[in-house]
Curated annotation (Swiss-Prot):
Gene assigned in the entry: rpoC
List of residues binding Zn(2+) 2: 800, 874, 881, 884
InterPro entries per record: DNA-dir_RpoC_beta_prime, DNA-dir_RpoC_beta_prime_bact, RNA_pol_asu, RNA_pol_N, RNA_pol_Rpb1_1, RNA_pol_Rpb1_3, RNA_pol_Rpb1_3_sf, RNA_pol_Rpb1_4
Binding site for Zn(2+) 1: 70, 72, 85, 88
Keywords, alphabetical: DNA-directed RNA polymerase, Magnesium, Metal-binding, Nucleotidyltransferase, Transcription, Transferase, Zinc
Family: Belongs to the RNA polymerase beta' chain family.
Species in which this protein is naturally found: Bdellovibrio bacteriovorus (strain ATCC 15356 / DSM 50701 / NCIMB 9529 / HD100)
Organism placement in taxonomy: Bacteria, Pseudomonadati, Bdellovibrionota, Bdellovibrionia, Bdellovibrionales
Protein name (Swiss-Prot/TrEMBL): DNA-directed RNA polymerase subunit beta'
């Protein structure tokens, strides 16, 4: 470890140290660093502009103002280097030392460092066992403290007010030592022996019984341990000498008009010096105590303000009423040292300009303005000019370049050739925001960008700007070419799909090229080759869209002329049937994907360029345009709207007669209009998607050539949703609050909107715009937190040897598969052999990567459970291993060692953040509310099988489901499960076990808007505790005059509204097959549907609870939901879940809470208290599994971890997060989320410390815990025990091992205070800390294994090809 001072001597090579430690500086050390004491508050002489001696800018202390010249001018020039002038005392040296030399101020009284005093928990207070208030009283001279009680009964560290002190003096006389102010606190701190105190506190912890006591002692023990384990001494938290920052870091610049601009620090220092000098003078004069106390307090406040202005007391402000920027403010926040200057720097050799389209460029090229290139490549041009002998000196070369002679341009072209440049568009949300291109010089002033890379950059040409950077060294050029070239970034790192996807005009052109037109000119001809067909088209014999036969790759194919032309540019490896379709956006994407998998990257780039060329060419030739007549209004629109209005009137009538509640009416009305809008949209689409063609006098119906339809169908512009607004009806709109307005807009844009309709539209739409602005900031902040939490996850080894993994199944939603198993396991490593159960054949061996072919086989054989390795369970100490991570999605091959998978994961999750909604619900301006699902319809023929279903037969002889976790399966002839329907409580089944079901038949149906309570036996109803006015009220609907019975909250807590099922004699019946009485607790807010003593049949509804008006899925969605999950927040009113498997019974209520008891078959029962008025989701006698919710409400992820463990938690988080992204149609691979969740589960909480060095309740890294326990087990001690912890991403980032990384993230002062007290060492293992220290990051080519390689360029080759390690040709290892 080297000291700060010697650190400044000469610039250190950033690689010459391995770790950085931060600790407290002792007063001796501060004086040792200093080049002299600053005694005066003066800065510079306003007439001579020379610094005042002994002042804040003193040349004697800090160094000369001019290079190699003393202040009085006696010694000038280099030859006197190192001489100290006897007249002015200035050393003759470079001015640069004024940036490095520290001074100091000798304080007249010790002063507390505000960080260690005020940063909670107060470190000084903790050590002295005093409250912060008391320490402040002593420091700010408001109270005395006992330093040494001697023979008296006082205690050391006891705080005495003036009155108490007088009383003590009267009682004991001056036989004890007391004091006030900084000296007293320093003396107390000096007396502390951390070793002894630590032992004492540890014993106290063992003896204490109370929770609070232990917590308090552990808190104190933490601070004591910090001092015990480090080189710090407690009294160093008090400053006796204050370092003064070098003057060039707090400059004073003269402005014109004789005024000065100065750094705020100078003001703060001046204040400290003034007060300090005044205090010294007062002490020399033996001034009265009260004046000295006041002065001491003011000195303490001045030093506080210098270190952290505004932390305590009133903030010091400058002349313009703005708070002064203290030393802490220099480090904190976005404008602080860490984030402004260390993590992000401005760089040389860069420029920026507006971008325009470069349709003639190849994929790896960009257009660079000549003027810009000349400036960027200046040094290279100078060098070439000298080489060619056109200039002999740099000065001469400079002159030539300034004159811009002809030779200069030639040389520039030569220099730029094959020298890649980096293009970057802000905001750089993922790594594809910076890519390398070869520059092509042009005369304009804008940068030209290849249209196909716009998706990756998220660029458009409406005035976007981009920055250019020039990689200088040969190594950086190699990396730019091999790793960053746009042609090497075809696949998206987020999901492994191509990101070079043509859009808009290109898609339109390709679609036009590959459409078929029945009866087009030259239909039915046959051609011997593609060239012949193209020739025929160009001479006008056949139409582009004519159906004909063409010989392609040796076989005669039925196709169109356009498709034949397209097939000519597609690589031979891709089969013709991939090309022989109408090319929409999706089909082109699939074609590019297929080409990449079959023909490789180079062929894909060539194909992409060709597709762009053809796309532009044919979209120009097609001449698409829209007229108002192309928006077809379906004839059926008017009758449909009339019909819907009729239905709405009927529902209104039902409501008026009191048959339904207002909530149900609203739901039904919204449903009717949503369905009507959909129907009209369908009609509208039918009207424009088909067209009748005349082929030789016969009428043939084919796909339409309506331009609007073409644009939407091809995916070039617009969507079905927009077409329905142009020609159908606009439909339902949402208010800014997210509710749906029940009167829809029946007009469309072709008919035009009335004023009221227009305002209904703008109402929701305006909210959308306001949202967008907020969304960007929120999304950016989420990305920043994600990057911070995952920045040190790097692929560190080949195989960690773990024998555990995750079980992957397809994802179902509402009985439909939303994600196949293939998509989830592709590119992952199999944990065990994947075996086909039918034939016992091994499909994939254990520890093999699952490839595209394997996926085909697995899906074909119907295997629906595969065990894979996962980053979540990887046992690597730092980072993850290759096997657990699997495939690098952006290259389609196994991941390399040193790949920064953490940051890629963070970017993949954060980048689509701006596409997610901010709303707490997920609807557009036009409300696209899905009609509530209320039936399960089978999509296959098969046999019904019921799984885990309890049911009763109802009045109509059908089965009513009586439990919550049953499901109905449909099994096909081969015995494979084709459908899996989750059944809700109260669903009515149309089939019994073993019944045959045909495709399209309804298996089950239920009421989606209410949760019913259903009778399980036929019996008579008997009320208990249901009395009108106390627990039930008859609510009379104001409009209809009909009454409904609603249970309300009762005044007394022991009343429970209950319905019993009794027989004729009034004896309570038991539930079928169990000796549990048939009784039903009716929750608050439920609507009773039966009267007292009424006869009911099994399956009848006794009461129903309304679900919220169509807000089922709309709890929190979008971005806030993702943030909530990653921050591991406990939801408000989270559901209580059962920790064990067992049967449910209800116990006696406690304080108005319902007591639910779960009794397992063996073992002890658990009790849960459920808040009053919450709906208990389980019923008496029901069997629940561990982890099942006992009440309605959101799940708390911490509970899942505690009850079901890390795997279940990760599955929950991955599913929940993916669901949000799926709704927006964003594909993210599971492994990215797993990497983040792994980081969230890094720590464990120590339950019992045993013989370890940990404290109970401490949070430690999992591997540190395991290492410590191994050590204890070897020594035969008692190991520590722990419980797993789920931390939110912000918490994880702040509690990382690296203090540099944590300080640059958030809460800078807190992190640095903590680190300094513990004298923490940062071993520079992550990426951020290395960037901050100015080193290469330990990832990719920055890994130690690459450091031995030296790159050389062979001049004799024609091409300037440079190889990377692994390509033997031109790389020699050093040493």
């Amino acid at each position: 470890m080297r000291d700060l001072l010697n650190f400044f001597d000469k610039p250190k090579d950033p690689l010459s140290f391995d770790a950085v430690r931060v600790s407290l500086a002792s007063p001796e050390m501060i004086r040792e660093w200093s080049f002299g004491e600053v005694k005066k508050p003066e800065t510079i002489n306003y007439r001579t502009f020379k610094p005042e001696r002994d002042g804040l800018f003193c040349a004697k202390i800090f160094g000369p103002i001019k290079d190699y010249e003393c202040l009085c001018g006696k010694y000038k020039r280099m030859k006197y280097r190192g001489v100290v002038c006897e007249k002015c005392g200035v050393e003759v040296t470079q001015t640069k030392v004024r940036r490095e030399r520290l001074g100091h101020i000798e304080l007249a009284t010790p002063v507390a460092h505000i960080w260690f005093l005020r940063s909670l928990p107060s470190r000084i207070g903790n050590l002295l066992n005093l409250s912060l208030k008391d320490v402040e009283k002593v420091l700010y001279c408001e109270a005395h403290v006992v330093i040494d009680p001697m023979e008296t009964t006082l205690e050391e560290g006891q705080v005495l007010t003036e009155e108490a002190l007088q009383a003590a003096l009267n009682e004991f006389g001056p036989s004890f030592k007391y004091g006030m102010g900084g000296e007293a606190v320093r003396d107390l701190l000096k007396k502390i022996d951390p070793e002894y105190l630590s032992r004492k506190l540890r014993l106290e912890v063992k003896d204490t019984k109370s929770e609070a006591g232990i917590k308090k002692l552990t808190k104190r023990l933490r601070v004591v341990e910090a001092f015990k384990g480090s080189i710090n001494k407690p009294e160093w938290m008090m400053l006796e000498a204050l370092p003064v920052l070098p003057p060039d870091l707090r400059p004073l610049v003269p402005l014109d008009g004789g005024r000065f601009a100065t750094s705020d620090l100078n003001d703060l220092y001046r204040r400290v010096i003034n007060r300090n000098n005044r205090l010294k003078r007062l002490q020399e004069l033996n001034a009265p105590d009260i004046i000295i106390r006041n002065e001491k307090r003011m000195l303490q406040e001045a030093v506080d303000a210098l270190l952290d202005n505004g932390r305590r007391g009133k903030t010091f402000t400058g002349p313009n009423k703005r708070p002064l920027r203290s030393l802490s403010d220099m480090l904190k926040g976005k404008q602080g040292r860490f984030r402004q200057n260390l993590l992000g720097k401005r760089v040389d050799y860069s420029g920026r300009s507006v971008i325009t389209v470069g349709p003639t460029l190849r994929l790896h090229q960009c257009g660079l303005p000549k003027k810009m290139a000349l400036e960027l490549f200046k040094p290279f041009v100078y060098n070439k000019l000298e080489e060619k002998g056109l200039a002999t000196t740099i000065k001469q070369a400079k002159r030539l370049v300034d004159q811009e002679t002809v030779e200069v341009w030639d040389i520039l072209a030569d220099v730029v050739k094959e020298h890649p440049v980096l293009l970057n568009r802000a905001p750089t949300l993922h790594r594809l925001g910076i890519q390398a291109f070869e520059p092509v010089l042009h005369e304009g002033k804008a940068i030209q960008l290849h249209p196909l890379v716009c998706t990756a950059f998220n660029a458009d040409f409406d005035g976007d700007q981009m920055a250019v950077h020039v990689p200088l060294s040969v190594e950086s050029q190699v990396e730019a070419r091999v790793l960053m070239m746009s042609t090497n970034n075809i696949l998206s790192p987020a999901n492994g799909k191509p990101i070079i996807n043509p859009s808009q005009d290109i898609v339109l052109g390709m679609y036009w090229l590959t459409r078929m037109r029945p009866g087009a000119k030259g239909s039915g001809k046959a051609f011997s080759s593609v060239q012949e067909a193209q020739y025929a088209f160009e001479t006008g014999l056949v139409d582009l869209q004519a159906v004909c036969k063409v010989r392609i790759n040796g076989t005669l194919q039925e196709t169109t002329v356009g498709r034949a032309i397209l097939s000519d540019i597609v690589p031979k490896e891709v089969p013709f049937n991939e090309v022989n379709v109408t090319m929409g956006k999706k089909q082109i994407a699939a074609l590019i994907d297929k080409t990449f998998r079959l023909a490789g990257a180079k062929a894909t780039c060539i194909l992409a360029d060709k597709i762009m060329e053809y796309g532009f060419k044919y979209s120009t030739a097609a001449g698409m345009s829209i007229g108002i007549d192309d928006m077809v209004i379906p004839a059926a629109k008017a009758p449909m709207i009339a019909d819907a209005e009729k239905q709405v009137t009927e529902i209104q009538q039902q409501y008026d007669e009191g048959l339904i509640t207002d909530g149900e009416r609203y739901n039904k009305v919204v449903d009717i209009w949503a369905q009507t809008a959909d129907k009209i949209a369908k009609e509208g689409m039918n009207a424009i998607e088909k067209q009748t063609f005349n082929v030789n006098g016969k009428e043939v119906v084919g796909p339409s050539f309506n331009p609007i339809y073409i644009m939407a169908d091809s995916g070039a512009r617009g969507s079905a949703a927009q077409i329905r607004q142009l020609g159908g009806m606009r439909g339902l709109m949402a208010k800014p609050s997210g509710e749906i307005i029940e009167t829809p807009i029946t007009a469309n844009f072709r008919e035009g909107l009335t004023v009221i309709q227009y305002f209904i539209s703008t109402h929701g739409a305006r909210k959308g715009l306001a949202d967008t602005a907020l969304k960007t900031a929120n999304s950016g902040y989420l990305t920043r937190r994600l990057v911070d939490v995952a920045q040190d996850v790097v692929v560190s080894e080949i195989d960690c040897g773990v024998e555990d993994g995750l079980e992957i199944t397809p994802i179902y939603e509402a009985g439909e598969i939303v994600q196949n198993i293939g998509d989830r396991i592709l590119g992952r490593t199999a944990l065990k052999d994947v075996v086909d159960a039918a034939t016992n054949e091994v499909v994939v061996r254990a520890n093999q990567e699952i490839t595209e072919n394997d996926v085909k086989i697995i899906e074909g054989r119907g295997i629906d459970k595969v065990d894979i390795r996962s980053a979540l369970i990887c046992q690597s100490k730092r980072g993850v291993c290759v096997k657990c991570y699997g495939r690098d999605l952006s290259r389609g091959a196994t991941v390399n060692l040193g790949e920064t998978v953490g940051i890629i994961a963070a970017q993949s999750i954060g980048e689509p953040g701006t596409q997610l909604t901010m709303r707490t619900f997920h609807l557009g301006g036009a409300a696209s509310r899905a009609v509530e699902q209320s039936v399960h319809t089978s999509r296959y023929d098969g046999v019904v099988k019921l799984q885990n279903v309890h049911a009763v037969t109802n009045r109509n002889g059908k089965l009513t489901v009586m439990n919550r976790n049953g499901s109905a399966l449909v099994i096909d002839e081969a015995g494979r499960e084709r459908e899996n329907f989750k059944l809700v409580y109260g669903a009515v089944l149309n089939f019994k076990e073993g019944d045959k079901v045909a495709k399209g038949q309804t298996v089950a149906e239920w009421d989606p808007y209410s949760n019913p309570i259903i009778a399980e036996v036929s019996a008579k109803i008997q009320y208990q505790d249901i009395e009108e006015g106390s627990t039930m009220q008859e609510q009379v609907d104001a409009v209809t005059g009909f009454a409904t019975k609603v249970i309300m909250e009762s005044k007394s807590s022991d009343v429970k509204p209950t319905v019993f099922l009794v027989d004729g004699a009034g004896k309570t019946l038991n539930l079928p097959g169990r000796d549990i009485p048939a009784r039903y607790l009716i929750p608050v807010g439920a609507q009773l549907l039966v009267a007292d003593q009424q006869e009911v049949h099994a399956g009848d509804v006794i009461a129903k609870m309304h679900r919220e008006a169509s807000k089922t899925k709309d709890i929190t969605g979008g971005l806030p939901r993702v943030a909530e999950l990653f921050e591991a927040r406990k939801p408000k009113e989270a559901a209580i879940i059962s920790e064990i498997d067992g049967y449910v019974t209800f116990g006696k209520d406690v304080k108005g809470k319902q007591r639910v008891i779960v009794t397992p078959e063996v073992g002890e029962q658990k009790e849960y208290l459920i808040p009053k008025g919450k709906h208990v989701a389980v019923r008496e006698g029901e069997y629940v599994r561990a982890g099942e919710a006992l009440m309605d409400g959101p799940t708390n992820p911490h509970d899942i971890l505690a009850v079901l463990g890390a795997k279940a938690l990760s599955a929950y988080l991955v599913d929940e997060i993916q669901e949000v992204y799926r709704l927006q149609g964003v594909g993210i691979n599971d492994k990215h989320i797993e990497v983040i969740v792994r980081q969230m589960l890094r720590k464990v909480e120590i339950r019992d410390a045993g013989d370890s060095r940990f404290l109970a309740g401490e949070q430690v890294e999992r591997y540190a815990y395991m290492e410590e326990n191994e050590r204890i087990n070897k020594e035969g001690g008692q190991p520590a025990t722990c419980s797993p912890l789920l931390l939110g991403i912000t918490k994880v980032s702040l509690s990382t091992d690296s203090w540099i990384s944590a300080a640059s993230f958030q809460e800078t002062t807190k992190v640095l205070t903590e680190a300094a007290i513990n004298s923490r060492t940062d071993h520079l293992r992550g990426l951020k800390e290395n960037i901050i220290m100015g080193r290469l990051i330990p990832a990719g080519t920055g890994l130690t294994s690459y450091k031995r390689w030296k790159v050389s360029v062979h001049e004799d080759d024609d091409i300037g090809f440079v190889a990377l390690p692994g390509m033997t040709s031109s790389v020699q290892p050093q040493g």
